[in-house]
């Protein structure tokens, strides 16, 4: 057994000992009273609200007012005379007043452990140091914690353990709680932003018979009653566009997508996506709308449009750079010429040298995107709209009027990561059918991420879809930016993990 394994074994033995002691205390509670886990305590204040409401009250003013409160929380520190509680908003001290609390209560308090949840009544007071606290007149145990909290000096520092036991991480790490409060604020702000502009929030199927709307590998399942294969959706796009056909001209959805692909600091098999569509608009309108949304979000969440991330600062207050795929390759790789990019064999050689997985059947547009992904994407630090994607890799996007070999599409990159994907939607049913057929050929040639042929979607387009612009924004990656989080697992409450050995 290694030293590390020995240390782990000793720690586990110590934890088991503490758990056994706590179970003995719970047994004593069960014996002493009929209900060991009562549910009749009603608090009337959160700690943060008390701190804010009475911030300007002096010690003398609080003594004179004798403001009664009922509070509840988890014991995080026990200093003898003062117990530090934590609720969902803040921490606050409660004072163990030996003059007012009954002897039996004082005796019971001595048996309480860190992690126990208590309810207390008393009056607000302020210490000589200026700290607000509750001078308790009564207190009781509401929930006995059977497992000890992480060591107060080291906390929960093992990253993988934080992800696996997020409930403990949330208990002991204020930074984690802040991250998920920000996530909630971001989603709420997006909903307000779009609703105020006339968008209708909708819900579309998670289980689909044909996985469409993105180039990705789906999760497959089986519907027993219908005896048919079904797929967890990889994107809601084709259903949202059906709604535009039906007459809902501005729609959005914030929900989960599922992709049966790799796990990394940027990828989780289950992730949250915003998709929105607006009729009588194009992809340039969406660029303007996206810039406005991102500036508002940063200002709302951070109080500034300068977004710190690692050792960099992203400037959301400045106009986002707009470059085509083709021009971005030339800008960031001066050794590559336009002639190189327009020659299939030269482009294939560049893509291979850059490390792309070249199968041999790719067209020029696909090769250009491969080169972009390998040689440009990671260099796009400040916000960049990369536009005019080749039609081969944009099967649902409208062709550009001036150059039909590219589409009216953009992807937004910040910090070298794709944050959003948008385009003027293809509403020509015959063109869409042809592109689906090309995707089927790609799939037959070995491209697992190529799209299926969706006959019902073609049927919908044949009724006529107005000129439309659509966009998808990855909520998880956006929250990573706004919370300075290095991994997507930091912003997903319960990320998927490999099984423990």
From Swiss-Prot:
One Pfam family, short name please? tRNA-synt_2
Q: Tell me the compartments it is located in.
A: Cytoplasm
What SUPFAM superfamilies does this protein's entry cite? Class II aaRS and biotin synthetases (SSF55681), Nucleic acid-binding proteins (SSF50249)
User: Where mainly found?
Assistant: cytoplasm
InterPro entries with a match to the protein in the record: Aa-tRNA-synt_II, aa-tRNA-synth_II, aa-tRNA-synth_II/BPL/LPL, Lys-tRNA-ligase_II, Lys-tRNA-ligase_II_N, Lys-tRNA-synth_II_C, NA-bd_OB-fold, NA-bd_OB_tRNA
Q: Name one GO biological process term.
A: lysyl-tRNA aminoacylation
Instruction: Report residues binding Mg(2+) 1.
Output: 411, 418
UniProt GO cellular component terms: cytoplasm; cytosol
EC number in record: 6.1.1.6
Extract the GO molecular function terms from the UniProt entry.
ATP binding; lysine-tRNA ligase activity; magnesium ion binding; tRNA binding
User: Which keywords label this protein?
Assistant: Aminoacyl-tRNA synthetase, ATP-binding, Cytoplasm, Ligase, Magnesium, Metal-binding, Nucleotide-binding, Protein biosynthesis
Q: Which proteins does it associate with, and in what oligomeric form?
A: Homodimer.
Tell me what this protein is called: Lysine--tRNA ligase
Q: Which organism is it from?
A: Pseudomonas aeruginosa (strain ATCC 15692 / DSM 22644 / CIP 104116 / JCM 14847 / LMG 12228 / 1C / PRS 101 / PAO1)
Give me the gene this protein comes from.
lysS
């Amino acid at each position: 057994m290694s030293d590390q394994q020995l240390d782990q074994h000793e720690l586990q033995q110590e934890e088991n000992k503490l758990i056994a002691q706590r179970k003995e205390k719970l047994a004593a509670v069960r014996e002493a009273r009929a209900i060991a886990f009562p549910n009749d305590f009603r608090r009337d204040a959160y700690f943060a609200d008390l701190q804010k409401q009475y911030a300007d009250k002096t010690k003398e003013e609080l003594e004179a007012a004798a403001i009664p409160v009922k509070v509840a929380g988890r014991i995080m520190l026990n200093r003898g005379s003062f117990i530090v509680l934590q609720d969902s908003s803040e921490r606050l001290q409660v004072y163990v007043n030996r003059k007012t609390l009954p002897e039996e209560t004082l005796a019971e308090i001595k048996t309480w452990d860190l992690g126990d949840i208590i309810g207390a009544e008393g009056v607000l007071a302020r210490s000589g140091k200026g700290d607000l606290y509750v001078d308790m007149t009564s207190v009781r145990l509401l929930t006995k914690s059977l497992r000890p909290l992480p060591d107060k000096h080291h906390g929960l520092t093992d990253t993988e353990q934080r992800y696996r036991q997020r409930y403990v991480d949330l208990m002991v790490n204020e930074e984690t709680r802040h991250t998920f409060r920000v996530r909630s604020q971001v989603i709420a702000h997006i909903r307000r932003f779009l609703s105020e502009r006339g968008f209708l929030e909708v819900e579309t199927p998670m289980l689909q018979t044909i996985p469409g709307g993105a180039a990705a590998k789906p999760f497959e399942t089986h519907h027993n009653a219908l005896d048919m294969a079904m797929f967890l959706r990889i994107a809601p796009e084709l259903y949202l566009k059906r709604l535009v056909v039906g007459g809902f001209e501005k729609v959005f959805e914030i929900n989960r997508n599922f992709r049966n692909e790799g796990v990394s600091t940027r990828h989780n098999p289950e992730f949250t996506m915003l998709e929105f569509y607006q009729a009588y608009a194009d992809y340039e309108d969406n660029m303007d709308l996206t810039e406005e949304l991102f500036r508002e979000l940063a200002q709302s969440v951070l109080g500034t449009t300068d977004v710190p991330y690692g050792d960099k600062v992203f400037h959301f207050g400045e106009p986002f750079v707009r470059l085509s795929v083709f021009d971005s390759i030339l800008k960031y790789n001066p050794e590559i010429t336009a002639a190189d990019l327009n020659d299939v064999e030269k482009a294939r050689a560049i893509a291979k040298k850059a490390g792309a997985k070249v199968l041999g059947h790719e067209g020029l547009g696909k090769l250009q995107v491969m080169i972009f992904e390998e040689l440009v994407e990671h260099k796009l630090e400040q916000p960049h709209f990369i536009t005019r994607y080749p039609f081969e890799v944009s099967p649902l996007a409208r062709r550009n009027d001036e150059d039909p070999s590219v589409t009216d599409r953009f992807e937004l990159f910040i910090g070298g990561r794709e944050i959003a994907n948008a385009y003027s939607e293809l509403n020509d049913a015959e063109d869409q059918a042809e592109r689906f057929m090309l995707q089927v050929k790609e799939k037959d040639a070995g491209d697992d991420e190529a799209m299926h042929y969706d006959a019902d979607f073609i049927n919908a387009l044949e009724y006529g879809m107005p000129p439309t612009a659509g966009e998808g924004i990855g909520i998880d990656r956006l929250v990573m930016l706004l919370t300075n989080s290095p991994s997507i697992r930091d912003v997903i409450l319960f990320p998927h993990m490999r099984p423990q050995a």
